[in-house]
């Protein structure tokens, strides 16, 4: 399970999820990627479930890159406790994902296997996604 080794503050503000992702919007390492179409918090358990679904389908072949990390803690108060009296205890870890962010990348497997593995991973996540293919940049290398 992915969790930070140490954090400066145990409790964080919730923040807002407006707009598109600043970075990580293109497939950088692998051949195929799973891109978020909407914004959401993704927990460390959901990331792990998606990773297991992909690697099991690929039969341990190929390589998987996880491009999101759950660095933000979320809190909740116990059931039956009245409002106020401070912020609740840290409950778990989430990764805030904005629109356009590539969450997972795959390489080293055929296209049909990669697409099915990413589809299975998408079912484990609470966000609408699309599968994107790496775009080759430029035609020929500059020769000098």
Curated annotation (Swiss-Prot):
Organism domain of life: Bacteria
A molecular function (GO) term: rRNA binding
UniProt KW rRNA-binding keyword: yes
Keywords carried by this UniProt record: Ribonucleoprotein, Ribosomal protein, RNA-binding, rRNA-binding, tRNA-binding
Pfam families: Ribosomal_L16
Described function: Binds 23S rRNA and is also seen to make contacts with the A and possibly P site tRNAs.
Family, as annotated: Belongs to the universal ribosomal protein uL16 family.
Name used for this protein in its record: Large ribosomal subunit protein uL16
Organism annotation: Listeria monocytogenes serovar 1/2a (strain ATCC BAA-679 / EGD-e)
Gene name per UniProt: rplP
């Amino acid at each position: 399970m992915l969790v930070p080794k140490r954090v400066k503050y145990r409790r964080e503000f919730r923040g807002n999820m407006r707009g598109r992702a600043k970075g990580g919007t293109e497939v950088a390492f692998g051949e195929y990627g799973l891109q978020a179409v909407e914004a959401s918090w993704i927990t460390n358990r959901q990331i792990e479930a998606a990773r297991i679904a992909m690697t099991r389908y690929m039969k341990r072949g190929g390589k998987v890159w996880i491009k999101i990390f759950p660095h933000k803690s979320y809190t909740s108060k116990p059931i039956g406790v009245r409002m106020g009296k401070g912020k609740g205890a840290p409950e778990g870890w989430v990764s805030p994902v904005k629109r356009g962010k590539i969450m997972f990348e795959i390489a080293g497997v055929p296209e049909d296997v990669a697409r099915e593995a990413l589809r299975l991973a998408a079912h484990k996540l609470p966000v609408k996604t699309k599968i994107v293919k790496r775009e080759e940049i430029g035609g020929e290398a500059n020769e000098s």
